[in-house]
Amino acid sequence: MISAKSVDVVERWVGSLTNLVLFVMMGFGLVCGGWSCQAQEITGMKLSDVSFVSELDKTVQKYVVLESDGFRRSTKKTLLVALHGHGADRWQYVREERDECRATREFAMKYGMLMISPDYRARTSWMGPAAEADLKQILAEVRELYSVESIIVSGGSMGGTSALIFGALHPDIVDGIVAMNPTSNMEEYGQFQEAIAESYGGSKAEVPQEYRKRSSELQFERLTMPVAVTTGGKDTLVPPESTLRLVEKLRGADRKVFLNHRSEGGHATTYEDGMQALEFVAEGLRLRQSEQ
C-alpha cells in the first residue's frame, strides 16, 4: 500500500552525484523552477513521485521512480520505463494489480532494476511530440542521477504502442522494448482519433508526417534492439495485424524479436506472457553486453 503521508521538496542537484542535495519545502503545491519529490513506500520498493518543468513548454510534468530494497545509485543498473495505457497516468504501473502491471513491477524487483513510470502527457499521449520530448528529458536527468547501464522501454496498449514509437524514434537511447497489445501503424489505426489528433497536432490529413514517423511498422529498420510483443487475435480495441506485420519485418531483417500471439486472446496480456516477454529482452541485453 502507498502511504498517504508525503512531503513535497525541491531537489537541486549541484555538480556531481556526490554533492549535497538541497531540500526546500514546497508551499502551496508549487514547483519553484526545479525538481520536486514526494518520498513514499510500497512493499519491497522505495517510491518517489517527481515533478519537473518541461523544457518544451515550461509546464509541470511528473513521473514516479521505484527503487528496489537495497538499491544503490552508484551501482550500474538497467532502467525499466513503464508507459501507461490510454486514460491512465503514471500510477497505473505502480498501483494496479492487473497482470501487465504486476509482471512489470515484479520483474524490476527480481533483477534489482530502477523503474520509472512517467505521465508522458497523460492521459491521452500516444507518444506525441510533447510526450516524446518529456521522456527524452526524463531519461537524460535520470542518467545524471543514477548509474544507468541500459534502458528497456515497456508498456501495454497505448503504452506498448508508445514504447515502439519511442524506440524507433530514438534507437540510440533505447536498448530493449517490451510492447504488450500495441498497434504498430498509426496511419491505419482507427480508435481514439480525437485524442491522438490533439497529441499529434492534427488529424491524419492535417499532419500525415507525424502519423507516419510514429508508425513503428513503417520505421522497422530503426528497431535495432531486442523487441518483445504480445498480441491477441480477438483484440478489437487495438487489432494485432500491424504488429504481426512488424514482427515479420523484424524477423526478415534478422533482428532479435519475440512474439506471443494468443489467437483467442483479447486486449490483455497474462502475467506469465508478460513476464516471458520481459525476460526475453533482459536475456537479449545480457547477450549483447557479454559480446561487447
Where are these regions (language model features)?
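The conserved beta1-alpha1 loop
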Residues: 81-85, 231
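Mobile cap/lid helix-loop segments that gate and shape the active-site cleft of serine hydrolases
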Residues: 92-96, 182, 186-219, 225
